[in-house]
């Protein structure tokens, strides 16, 4: 039986298997199968039809010799019968079945409203289709858009992907669950701003936190957990293309009209007073605008109220809340460059960067294999890995991908924010902080030696508390012959007594090494060609790029019995000033001048010349608990201290090798020094030798202010700092809203429970 050309209608090819496009065959596949719209290998109807027309002539001759009747019986006689089974093969189960379902689908689906989390491996496929090349070397290839956040994220954005937010969309909720149960369940991870339960009968609720770290912690801990015999399905919820006023990203502030001389560290000093800063970001080609992102929305609100319309470096700044949507903005600009003329649209639609959701440390040590592991073994791309050449697996550096339209390529800006001191209003009246104009943009690198791919780094805790490694300090401290500019922000922002610093020991942050002053290194292949760190890392091969101290200045008294000591600052010798003059250095200083800053001088203490009371106890065995440390201290120093904090590595469930203690008076420092410094520890047969140094944050009040809004207050109370009320009794006095304050009672707070320790 001959089959004439054209008998195979184009519509009938919907029933052909998609595998037909993968294998050559003399006969088409006629077997009926369901349509798979997600099959990435299916061909268009026109392509398949043209191919079948090409083979139709030969098919007739081949069928003459064989059994043609079964095939003839399968063909329909008329056109209606040909289309009759088409709809039967379509899977309509995903469409809403009721009016209520239709409303939910409209609110949370792809048509608008809130964007739900997508599968990370789904996003991986999309990301690879947008692969870009940073330079001509294949080894240096990095995807521009890789993964979504919330599941082992890395730097990079997907235009329509999900980013961590402070609001969680919780599905599969049992309608019998009480609101109080939900409140108690989610409140253990942080203060809840709003709990929306009006749609609980439909199976979902919305939980909004003030702190983005709380929402991420809740998602990690509760994802898939059973609640009333139902597994929770949790997603981040963020506004889509046209956010309303209530969807404004309250945690990120846009700073307009900045002077070019104001660096990220300057902004950190100014804005960090109001809360912990997650990130400070720059905008390509517009250095007079920057984004300051806080972990907590309340901190951003406080900074907005206090600093809006104030002057920094002689220019009046303007602050506004940022809006999500910057990733979509970049794509729209490529299609319509005229949008670039609208500055307000550009900066009010800046998306939250997914950088902070990147896991701390190296992916190779992660319990979850990252999806690029298999991709990096490709024979085409070679050894591709985002953690390639990272030699310090416990320290993760923030990197942000910034699209430079003029140069047509993507640069990696290393913008890790490190801790710096903050000052209150009273201190500025007596001594205003001076910052040389030549500092430019500051980063948290240590000494960059002559090797082009080697960068030494200080861990965040060392920046926070001081006591750096000697290898991080230069031969000569920094000084400048230029006129220094001042930042007159203290006159407008009222009382700035709360001292906040970046970082509060997230999981896996602290190194496993018992020696906390050890230095790690991060290497970048071809770094000099495709890496910028603010303005200072243009040439990483320069041997003159050093970690330098700020200009010599005495300790600053904050007005509340606390002292602040100057922090280290990194500048580039090779980076000229804007007017062409170069930086100069004082040759009279040496490395010892910097290190002595945090060393204890018993003679000065005995003469009353050193008022500092907060100490860092280093080289503590990692198995020591807080109670063990308290017992060791109380053997000879009971009642001489009023604050103790033993940082915990939550990943490894042990301490990180050091602790911080505040003595009631400087005179008690000598006894503690004699009891511990240079001595071995009694327990666990440890060979570690204890050593003492001064901490950077000084004074009980400053320590309490630092931890007031820290996410550490959401952790187990055994991991939190404790404040004592003198020699009579000792209690942890952490209260609601994650605040510390000294206890003046011999009864423990009801939120804490029984006494932790008594003398």
Curated annotation (Swiss-Prot):
<dbReference type="GO" id="GO:0003723">
    <property type="term" value="F:RNA binding"/>
</dbReference>
<dbReference type="Pfam" id="PF04059">
    <property type="entry name" value="RRM_2"/>
</dbReference>
<dbReference type="InterPro" id="IPR034454">
    <property type="entry name" value="MEI2-like_RRM3"/>
</dbReference>
<feature type="domain" description="RRM 2">
    <location>
        <begin position="251"/>
        <end position="324"/>
    </location>
</feature>
<dbReference type="InterPro" id="IPR000504">
    <property type="entry name" value="RRM_dom"/>
</dbReference>
<dbReference type="InterPro" id="IPR034453">
    <property type="entry name" value="MEI2-like_RRM1"/>
</dbReference>
<dbReference type="Pfam" id="PF00076">
    <property type="entry name" value="RRM_1"/>
</dbReference>
<dbReference type="InterPro" id="IPR012677">
    <property type="entry name" value="Nucleotide-bd_a/b_plait_sf"/>
</dbReference>
<dbReference type="InterPro" id="IPR035979">
    <property type="entry name" value="RBD_domain_sf"/>
</dbReference>
<dbReference type="GO" id="GO:0005634">
    <property type="term" value="C:nucleus"/>
</dbReference>
<dbReference type="GO" id="GO:0045927">
    <property type="term" value="P:positive regulation of growth"/>
</dbReference>
<dbReference type="GO" id="GO:0045836">
    <property type="term" value="P:positive regulation of meiotic nuclear division"/>
</dbReference>
<dbReference type="InterPro" id="IPR007201">
    <property type="entry name" value="Mei2-like_Rrm_C"/>
</dbReference>
<feature type="domain" description="RRM 1">
    <location>
        <begin position="166"/>
        <end position="239"/>
    </location>
</feature>
<keyword id="KW-0469">Meiosis</keyword>
<comment type="function">
    <text>Probable RNA-binding protein that plays a role in meiosis and vegetative growth.</text>
</comment>
<keyword id="KW-0694">RNA-binding</keyword>
<keyword id="KW-0677">Repeat</keyword>
<protein>
    <recommendedName>
        <fullName>Protein MEI2-like 3</fullName>
    </recommendedName>
</protein>
<dbReference type="GO" id="GO:0051321">
    <property type="term" value="P:meiotic cell cycle"/>
</dbReference>
